[in-house]
Amino acid sequence: MSVSLVRRVIIALSIAAFGSGMSMRIMDPMLVQLSLDFAIPLGMASWTITVFGVAYGFAQLIFGPLGDRYGKVKIVAWGCCACSLAALFCGITTEFTGLLIARIFAGITAASIIPLAMAWIGDVVVYEHRQSVLAKFLIGQILGLSTGVFLGGFSVDFFHWRLPFFFICVWFAAISAYLGLVIQRLPKSTHIIQLGEGVGLSRTVGEFRQVLNVAWSKQVLLTVTLEGAAVFGALAFIPAHLHTVHNVSLFSSGAFVVLFGLGGLAFAFRSRFWVSRFGEVGLIRTGALLMCTALLSLAWIPFWWWLMPACFLFGLGFYMMHNTLQINATQMAPERRGAAVAAFASCFFMGQSLGVAINGSLFSVVGTPVLLSCSGLLLLIVGSRFAQLRQLRITH
């Protein structure tokens, strides 16, 4: 298969990841408006984020083995088609319960995209080049996360919170059609299909058991669960923090959070430099330290102008740490890479849901400064521990 064809497929998958990123974070700046429109507490409004993450996490247990069995890119293409319908349902529902159901559907369908795309890259790109290729692929997701927050805040302030979902609907429909055409040009050698033993549920359980039988897998999965809880448990409430503590408009608070994505881009575009400069262990340690510093600054420094570099450093630190965890995930169980990366993504999003749910319940009790501080300190502890374990694994 030609390098140019691989590049085109990766770009297409990155565009799909852009849509997935928008879906993930589109609700963050909408929470205040949702609480007003539906006459519900802010913590209850945050369930639109929580249910997406829970659905996304559990759905990985299905899509990972499906990708291994039927072809990863094919499942991504069909998943994008379903994502288009899910976004449409989010935009047309008129009840909060209906919105929650639509967000569950959106989480399930979005689960088919990024992990299987990462697993396919793991199939076709050698390990030595995989981290930089994955970083470039994730540019789509990074931009999607930032665009989702920005678009959500912009629509709430100037139009209507439903508007972005129709844009997401069209986006997924277009990329689904394109991927359907690309699949026909892929040689059979790229459709790596692994058939597990048994049938149905027993086969799926067996594939995940193979992943968990690897001791290092447990360490990676625990770390990414705690990382997801701390990072996105904080990120979901940064717009509310800026709005309530610094009197920043919802649109502007969404724009501030875009800087989180720009920090990620700073890592992705210079990934070869960061990897060669710090190595895996250094990226974990530096990323955790940057995130802790950024969140403590956001929580307690009273100067609004510091919010901009703090959000940027938060994003840079996150992608330093998370990209390194991702590269470890692709190599946890190479013979079951789809299931392994799916387990990784499942733990990540279950962690996100846990973090948002906990912070949502504590928001009115302790306030956002305490929530952001606790998240930052947890990231420092988790990152330092994993860096130490990774160093021991390298030296032994």
Model regions: which residues?
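Helix-to-loop junctions at the C-terminal end of transmembrane segments
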Residues: 60-71, 267-279, 363
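Cytoplasmic helix-loop-helix junction between adjacent transmembrane helices
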Residues: 102-140
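Juxtamembrane intracellular "pre-TM" segments in multi-pass secondary transporters
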Residues: 2, 184-220
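Helix-loop-helix hairpin linking two adjacent transmembrane segments in secondary transporters
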Residues: 98, 126-127, 136-183
